Design a protein with these regions (language model features):
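Flexible hinge/capping segments at coil-to-helix
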Residues: 137-155
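Extracytoplasmic small-molecule ligand-binding "clamshell" domains
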Residues: 32-112, 120
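Extended ligand-binding regions for polar small-molecule ligands
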Residues: 32, 73-82, 147, 162, ...
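N-terminal secretory signal peptides and thylakoid transit peptides that target proteins
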Residues: 1-16, 23-29
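A ligand-binding cleft/hinge motif common to bilobed small-molecule-binding domains
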Residues: 95-96, 112-121, 167-170, 196-226
Length: 283
């Protein structure tokens, strides 16, 4: 079973704070340039991308050189090449990148789940990849299924308002769910013994384990196998050429296994080797 059929429709909690009404969204869009994104990138030769500090392996910033690396950075460069353009990065957050798209500050945002709440205010490309879900547990605890977590004596850390929380409440509701503000707090809760495990998507979980040797292994949970599309966010426009281009770009590079290469290379920058990636995971 896929969470995209069962649970995404109820994802009112979302993963970001978006505008409170469509009227606000419309005002933000009205302030953006009337020039289409496709024409703007083609003519200016600049692709403006939301860069997310601390969100490795999508984005890694070298403090000394201010250079950006990571899987999303390589994807952005490849997209820009099609327009003979350079990439310009605007530091942002997941939540602010939605607002930045609406106001026309950026042309593209990476690594967004297309929740119904977000889709009220921005558009999305077709999936860049499907992002599976699992858990990082304390050492000695190795659950295999959601049922292994769905017990009153299991303490499950989740970041409040995230799809991680949504999955936990749908499939492990009998567990003691501990809501915390950030993913880092959730990981710390497992390290310090406050929680038995934390729910994380594959990319985030694998990276967390490499950063924190005191944690147990990352495990993709089964029954059900939960996964969500990971997409690129764009501004809603009458001219559909930009989103059409990104759809074709995603389909082509996913089919050619180039997305997989960028993913593996980005994970390697954070110490995650191909052999660390669970066999159930496919990019």
């Amino acid at each position: 079973m896929d969470i995209s059929r069962r649970a995404v429709g109820t994802a009112a909690i979302g993963t970001v704070v978006v505008t409170s009404s469509l009227a606000v969204a419309e005002r933000a869009n009205a302030q953006a340039s009337t020039e289409s994104t496709f024409d703007r990138v083609k003519q200016s030769k600049v692709l403006r991308v939301a860069a997310l500090p601390g969100e490795s392996p999508y984005f890694n910033k070298n403090i000394a050189t201010s250079e950006w690396t990571g899987m999303a950075v390589e994807m952005a460069k490849n997209i820009a090449t099609s327009f003979d353009a350079k990439v310009e990065y605007l530091e942002s957050t997941y939540g602010n990148s939605v607002l930045d798209l609406q106001s026309g500050k950026i042309d593209l945002a990476f690594a967004l789940n297309p929740t119904p709440q977000r889709a009220l205010v921005i558009g999305f490309s077709r999936p860049v990849f499907m992002h599976g879900f699992g858990t990082v547990a304390k050492k000695g605890f190795e659950p295999k299924t959601w049922g292994d977590l769905n017990k009153p004596d299991i303490r499950i850390a989740v970041d409040i308002g995230s799809v991680h929380e949504l999955a936990a409440r749908n499939f492990a509701s009998k567990g003691e769910i501990i809501g915390l503000k950030t993913r880092d707090e959730c990981v710390l809760a497992v390290q310090t013994g406050r929680a038995d495990c934390v729910i994380l998507a594959v990319i985030l979980g694998l990276t967390a384990v490499k950063k924190n040797p005191a944690l147990g292994k990352y495990i993709v949970l089964r029954d059900p196998f939960v996964q969500l599309p990971n997409c690129m966010g764009v501004r809603y426009e009458v001219d559909k050429r930009w989103r059409d281009f990104l759809d074709n770009w995603a389909d082509y590079n996913r089919g050619a296994a180039q997305i997989r290469k960028w993913m593996i290379d980005g994970l390697a920058l954070n110490g995650v080797m191909p052999e660390d990636i669970p066999s159930q995971v496919g990019f």
